[in-house]
Design a protein with these regions (language model features):
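Helix-to-loop junctions at the C-terminal end of transmembrane segments
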Residues: 89-103, 188, 375-391
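Transmembrane core module of solute transporters
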Residues: 44-47, 54, 59-62, 71, ...
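Hydrophobic transmembrane-helix bundles of small-molecule transporters
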Residues: 194-327
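Transmembrane-helix exit segments and adjacent C-terminal regions of multi-pass membrane proteins
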Residues: 2-11, 508-592
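Cytosolic juxtamembrane N-terminal segment immediately preceding the first transmembrane helix
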Residues: 1-59, 68
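Small-residue-rich alpha-helical segments with characteristic i,i+4
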Residues: 162, 176-188, 424-502
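Helix-loop-helix hairpins in multi-pass membrane proteins, especially solute transporters
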Residues: 93, 97-256
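Interfacial helix-cap and linker-helix signal at transmembrane-aqueous boundaries
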Residues: 66-67, 97-98, 121, 130, ...
């Protein structure tokens, strides 16, 4: 009887201790990262990002040769479209997987997926295998990106998060943007496009090992002090038998919701993307309209399922109901849409109406990419010192609207000519810096208002919103361009010649500069691109309303609150661990 009472007493004490637990284990885990281990982790991410970006820019060199090998098969374009959609729709599912299985497993899965994709590129003997490789590669790239974003959120304070979000990508993107082209050309000269793809199947998994290794080591350190994430087995509660296990997995991962989400977005985006730049005639086909209607209805079904029936919804409503989440996602949709209205035909416009060389036109576009990475990094540093999110969001929005408005003048100065290359580079650089400031600040403000468990899903919805906005913008741009430009050219040159000029910038550039015909072509291009510029700035104007609605987050105050909770949790965990092992636990110096 006395033994039973003692057992009951022990259980009661344990229950009381558990009730007293601060419940901030994830915040406490951050306390275990020293400045040294954090530096190693960011260095590992920088290494992997460098080679991932190098992969992308060398692949751009190989792609025409791979396409030629398959006689320019039209399905390759479709594969590129599908890969783009995969990037958009996979983020929420991958975020859920990262929460269930852990960050090291996510990084490993991403590296393996990218390796499989590049191996399939290198070994393909038909177009179907090449298309499958495209999907694996896109899926792996998205997987790494979302896990990296979640991992950085795991290990950094809000004040420092903007810097560490952007550091690996910014430092690696700029040199690889130019170096990738030279490396790709060198490989084609000395070997073949197959080896150019195949080498990344070896390089990417190897360069992922340091990142995975440091995470596994830190997880073991967390277990040592009693701070391991006490995750229940993924199959806990599953019924016996294969059917019961399948049902359990479907419930845990919300596979029905995932399929409805992926199907709804894919059926909506696929016809929009295919119509996109060059196939706006597809809007007259009933199949395109029907597919969009079914896609929208499927997406509505997803909302109903996740809101009413799913026990573990892939996107919990409490996540998307938060004001800063809604504003952040709406803002990046608007930013990406505005940019994608003006940008798709800019290179063609500069080469025809501006008489730019292909290299000069490429430099204008690259200026925005470089400026974005610089702007994002500067924004991260600014957030560290300003410690408030709204000022940097407002600065980014002002720069975006200014940079979107400048092309209205630059594309058709006095109705006779366009601006110089430096003027366009300045305009695109302003836009890049503006996007860097706005998007980094919005992402930090989104994560700052979320509970730890919801950060992954909220970030996934945010990243998907960027892709959705880009697709909408390209669709609008294609509709305007393919409607206005041919009509203007036909009015000057007649149906046959007008259609030929519209169909090829090579034909358009063959007309002598200064001739009446070339002047007419240039005027048609200027007027059409100016219309796109007007559309772009009109869309960006919506940001003025959104930036007013976004809630400012005081990062230092939020960090102090979380740090206090983390200290309590760490002290509790160490106390429990020492009581079990009857030995003191020493922590490393330099903990943050």
């Amino acid at each position: 009887m006395q033994q039973i009472n003692m057992a009951d007493s022990t259980r009661n004490e344990t229950a009381v201790e558990e009730e007293m637990r601060p419940r901030a284990a994830n915040e406490a885990l951050r306390k275990l990262w020293t400045t040294q281990t954090l530096g190693i982790a960011i260095g590992c991410l920088l290494l992997m990002n460098f080679f991932m970006n190098l992969t992308v820019y060398t692949q751009n060199v190989y792609e025409p040769y791979a396409t030629s090998h398959f006689d320019g098969h039209s399905l390759l374009t479709t594969g590129s479209i599908i890969a783009g959609i995969v990037r958009i729709v996979s983020y929420p599912l991958l975020a859920k997987l990262a929460n269930h299985f852990g960050r090291p497993q996510g990084f490993a899965g991403a590296a393996v997926s990218m390796a499989i994709g590049n191996a399939m590129y290198a070994s393909c003997r038909n177009v179907d295998t090449f298309l499958a490789g495209t999907i694996f590669d896109a899926f792996g790239d998205s997987w790494w990106n979302i896990v990296q974003q979640i991992f950085v959120a795991d290990i950094t304070s809000l004040v420092n998060r903007g810097i560490l979000f952007t550091l690996p990508e910014s430092l690696s993107a700029i040199p690889t943007l130019y170096g990738g082209t030279y490396l790709g050309e060198h490989i084609l000269t000395t070997s073949s496009w197959r080896w150019g793809y195949g080498m990344w199947a070896i390089v990417l998994p190897v360069t992922a090992i340091p990142t995975i290794g440091i995470m596994i080591w830190m997880n073991r350190r967390a277990k040592h002090v009693g701070l391991s994430n006490e995750k229940v087995s993924f199959m806990h509660g599953a019924s016996s038998g294969p059917i019961g296990k399948v049902k359990h997995i479907a419930t845990q991962l919300d596979l029905i919701g995932a399929l409805l989400l992926i199907g709804g977005l894919a059926m909506t985006l696929l016809p929009m993307t295919i119509a996109g730049r060059n196939n706006t005639d597809r809007w007259s086909r009933p199949s395109s309209i029907v597919l969009i209607i079914i896609g929208v209805l499927t997406f509505v079904a997803f909302l109903v399922w996740d809101g009413k029936f799913a026990s573990n919804p892939i996107i919990p409503y409490r996540t998307i109901r938060e004001r800063n989440v809604i504003i952040a996602c709406a803002s990046v949709i608007t930013i990406a849409m505005s940019d994608s209205i003006y940008r798709p035909f800019l290179s063609s416009f500069l080469q025809v109406a501006g008489h730019y060389s292909p290299g000069a036109a490429t430099r204008v576009d690259n200026a925005q990419r470089v400026a974005y990475n610089i702007g994002a990094l500067v924004c991260g540093v600014t957030l560290k010192f300003v410690k408030n999110t709204k000022p940097t969001i407002m600065l980014g929005v002002v720069l975006i609207i200014l940079a979107s408005g400048l092309p209205i003048y630059l594309t058709n100065i006095s109705g006779t000519h366009i601006a110089s290359e430096p003027a366009f580079i300045t305009s695109k650089s302003l836009l890049g810096v503006g996007r860097g400031f706005a998007q980094v600040s919005l992402q930090v403000s989104l994560q700052a208002v979320m509970e730890y468990e919801q950060v992954a899903i909220a970030t996934a919805v945010y990243l998907s919103s960027v892709g959705l906005g880009s697709n909408l913008g390209v669709t609008i741009s294609g509709a305007i361009w393919n409607s206005l430009l041919p009509r203007k050219l036909v009015a000057f040159f007649g149906e046959e010649d007008g259609r030929k000029i519209f169909g090829s910038i090579v034909v358009a550039r063959e007309y002598e500069v200064g001739s009446a015909e070339r002047n007419a072509i240039d005027e048609c291009y200027r007027q059409t691109q100016q219309t796109l510029a007007i559309g772009s700035v009109c869309v960006s104007g919506v940001l003025l309303v959104l930036v007013y609605l976004v809630r400012n987050v005081k990062l230092d105050a939020e960090d102090e609150k979380r740090a206090a909770q983390a200290d309590e949790e760490l002290a509790w965990a160490i106390k429990q661990k020492e009581a079990k092992e009857d030995a003191p636990i020493e922590l490393e110096e330099g903990r943050r």
